[in-house]
Amino acid sequence: MTDLSTLFHAAILGVVEGLTEFLPVSSTGHMIIVGHMLGFTGDKAETFEVIIQLGSILAVVVVFWRRLFGLIGIHFGEVPHEGKTNGKLKLSHIILAMLPAVTLGLMFHDVIKSLFNPQSVMYALVIGGVLLITAEILKPKTPKAEGLDDITYRQAFMIGCFQCLALWPGFSRSGATISGGMLMGVNRYTASEFSFILAVPMMMGASGLDLYKSLHFLSASDIPMFAVGFVTAFVVALVAIKTFLALIKRISFIPFAIYRFIVAAAVYWVFM
């Protein structure tokens, strides 16, 4: 039987996952710190993180379901905040953006796994923050892509190349792809939307594979803990995504970069 303290810890981790998964601040860095503080580590903790990531992914599907169906040619009227779309953003754009990270991820899987340690994550947090600042400084004054349907195949592929940086734990997948999009001439809001949509197949594939490998760690007694974490991550991620998209219309990514430096300092203080 799962005790209340375990469920409370599951809810806390669900909140952390939901808040940080799609913000350019690195969910990995936060989960390492909070998991350490709660004493929740090991194989079961890793399996739990996979489960709650699926909750975050579901939140993206709920927010962008019209766009996701539109990728395969099924349209349900106007997309909120965009109006009528011309359907130029297709599944082929997403597949092209996925290829670099999928290829490198399969080739260097063991190397990437070895990077899941506090010191490596700390460095990734700092360098990812520098990239966010660089993107804000060097982005074109006049964006070439103002909406998702303006994104070219070249831009999609280059964003996918930047996504390879996120194979380094702590770098932040959204931070890498959004920065890459901005440097390629995609405006901040659209780069964020593309990053979220790209996250669905990427994270579902990675999480699905990790879950399959971790099935032997699951037991019926863990269902309440997993359920609480999953639902909490879903609800919090839903709010976080909508709030983030509204916020970045008014502010730059500099505050997120500064926050990353603070988290890196926290990792150093806790683990070094």
Swiss-Prot record:
Tree of life domain: Bacteria
**Catalytic activity, EC:** 3.6.1.27
What Gene Ontology cellular-component terms does the record carry?
Answer: plasma membrane
Any one Gene Ontology molecular-function term assigned to this protein's record: undecaprenyl-diphosphatase activity
Q: Which reaction does this enzyme catalyse, per its entry? A: di-trans,octa-cis-undecaprenyl diphosphate + H2O = di-trans,octa-cis-undecaprenyl phosphate + phosphate + H(+)
User: Which cysteine pairs are covalently linked by disulfides here?
Assistant: none
Q: Which HAMAP family would you find in this protein's record?
A: Undec_diphosphatase (MF_01006)
**PANTHER family found in the cross-reference section:** UNDECAPRENYL-DIPHOSPHATASE
Task: Give the NCBIfam families listed for this entry.
Answer: PRK00281.1-1, PRK00281.1-2, PRK00281.1-4, undec_PP_bacA
What's this protein's name? Answer: Undecaprenyl-diphosphatase
Q: Which organism is it from?
A: Photorhabdus laumondii subsp. laumondii (strain DSM 15139 / CIP 105565 / TT01) (Photorhabdus luminescens subsp. laumondii)
**Taxonomic classification:** Bacteria, Pseudomonadati, Pseudomonadota, Gammaproteobacteria, Enterobacterales
